[in-house]
Structure formats: C-alpha cells, structure tokens
C-alpha cells in the first residue's frame, strides 16, 4: 500500500475524504520543500486541509446526501465535512452588534496609534500620557466580549451546496469573529425546514480558514454587511 492510499485511509477514519490528486500534490510539495514527504502524518495533512477549499481538496462522499433546503425532520447520520461561509448572530440586535464592532474597529486604530507613538518616544520625542481613549475603547470592547447568544451559519459542502446551520446550544469556536472557511465535522444531525440543528454533540470545529474569503472580513467587511442588512429592514 503506497503512502497516498495509507494516508487517505487514515483520514477517512477521521471522517475526512480527500481527493487523491490533491493529496498527491501535497505530498509532492512537502517532499520538495520540506523533505518530510516520507514522514507525513494525517495530522500534518489536516493542517493543510483546513486551509484549503474543500470543493477542491475533498470528495463528494463527505458532502450532504441530498438537497438540504428541501428536507424537514430528516436526520443525516453520516459524517459531513463543511466549511463556514458566513456567521450571523441572531440573538442580539444588529444595532448592538454594530456598536460593538465599531468599538472594536476603533480599538484597532488606537492600538496602531499607540505603537507609532511609542516608536517616536524611543526616538527621543517628548512622551505623551494621553492614550487617545485607548483605555475607554478597551473597556467598551470588554463589555461586549461575550457578544454571543445564538449563531446562524451559511455552510458549504464539497459539492458547493450551501445551506443554513443553527446553533441549538452554544458551540465553542463559533462567534462573529470566526474565520470564514473554518472547517466543521457534522454527524448525526437533524434537519428541520432545511436547516441543520447544530450542537456540541454533533459538531466538531477543526479550525482553519480560506484566506481569500477571510481577508479583511472581521470586523471591517462584516460591519458593511450588517449595515446593508439593517438598511433593508428599515426600507
């Protein structure tokens, strides 16, 4: 049994079904760049897999077995590997979310200003005690650090089918700041009115992201999306 077949079998046991072509390309890359091809483990492959687009790296065997949006009171027992396209907090008003996200964006800017000022101080410039509101911004963000009630997700499988998932109970690792492209393993999940009912017992967060999707998304692009959604509700 060659290395590709061995790794593919081991990954399948973990609930992940990779495309042989993608796996072989990864092994060739590792052998050439890092000289680790002979010692490649399933855990190492997973590090690259969670950073990939599962439409390109995994097979349809790990996808939803039918059109999810058309199902009701159906349980999907097999393991699905999915990636997060969007996260929405539906237990907190959009207005409150925007207040929190704007405070967070302001904090990022103030931290940048603070770093620049410290560089100037080390250069011999006069030190200033005013933190330009950094403390106030930190306090504001800290108050919103538990900005989590119930999340609704847009999920995608290896066939490119997209559908909703809803937290029935809080799942650690799912919140507004979750990276787009984060991978999940979902097993034995109930579908109600076309929505996956997610909880910690049927959902495992693998992590990762898709760089193209996630770049500059949180909080900058998320703020713009929420503003657009808010304006539609007022129209």
Swiss-Prot record:
Keywords: Cell cycle, Cell division, Cytoplasm, DNA damage, DNA-binding, Meiosis, Nucleus. One of its GO terms (cellular component) is cytoplasm. Transmembrane segments: none annotated. Gene3D superfamilies: RecQ-mediated genome instability protein Rmi1, C-terminal domain. InterPro entries: RMI1_N (IPR049363), RMI1_N_C_sf (IPR042470), RMI1_OB (IPR013894). GO terms for biological process: cell division; double-strand break repair via homologous recombination; meiotic cell cycle. The keyword Cytoplasm applies. It is found in: Cytoplasm; Nucleus. GO terms for molecular function: four-way junction DNA binding. It comes from the Eukaryota. PANTHER family: RECQ-MEDIATED GENOME INSTABILITY PROTEIN 1 (PTHR14790:SF15), RECQ-MEDIATED GENOME INSTABILITY PROTEIN 1 RMI1 (PTHR14790). Belongs to the RMI1 family. Structure-specific DNA-binding protein with a preference for cruciform structures. Also binds single-stranded DNA (ssDNA). Functions together with top3 to maintain genome integrity. Essential for proper meiotic cell division. Required for normal S-phase progression and DNA damage response. This is RecQ-mediated genome instability protein 1. The lineage of its organism: Eukaryota, Fungi, Dikarya, Ascomycota, Taphrinomycotina. The gene is rmi1.
């Amino acid at each position: 049994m060659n290395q590709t077949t061995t790794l593919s079998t081991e990954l399948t046991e973990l609930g992940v079904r990779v495309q042989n072509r993608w796996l072989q390309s990864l092994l060739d890359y590792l052998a050439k760049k890092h000289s680790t091809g002979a010692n490649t483990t399933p855990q190492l492959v997973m590090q690259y897999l969670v950073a990939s687009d599962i439409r390109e790296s995994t097979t349809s065997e790990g996808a939803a077995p039918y059109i999810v949006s058309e199902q009701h009171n159906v349980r999907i027992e097999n393991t699905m590997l999915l990636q997060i396209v969007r996260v929405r907090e539906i237990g907190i008003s959009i207005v409150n979310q925007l207040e929190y996200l704007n405070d967070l964006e302001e904090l990022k800017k103030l931290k940048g200003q603070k770093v620049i000022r410290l560089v100037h101080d080390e250069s011999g410039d006069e030190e200033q005690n005013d933190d330009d509101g950094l403390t106030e911004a930190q306090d504001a963000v800290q108050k919103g650090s538990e900005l989590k009630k119930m999340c609704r997700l847009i999920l995608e499988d290896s066939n490119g089918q997209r559908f909703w998932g809803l937290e029935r109970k809080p799942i650690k690792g799912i919140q507004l700041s979750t990276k787009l492209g984060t991978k999940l393993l979902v097993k034995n999940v109930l579908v109600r009115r076309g929505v996956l009912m997610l909880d910690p017992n049927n959902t495992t967060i693998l992590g990762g992201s898709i760089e193209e999707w996630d770049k500059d998304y949180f909080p900058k692009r998320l703020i713009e999306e929420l503003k657009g959604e808010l304006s539609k509700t007022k129209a």
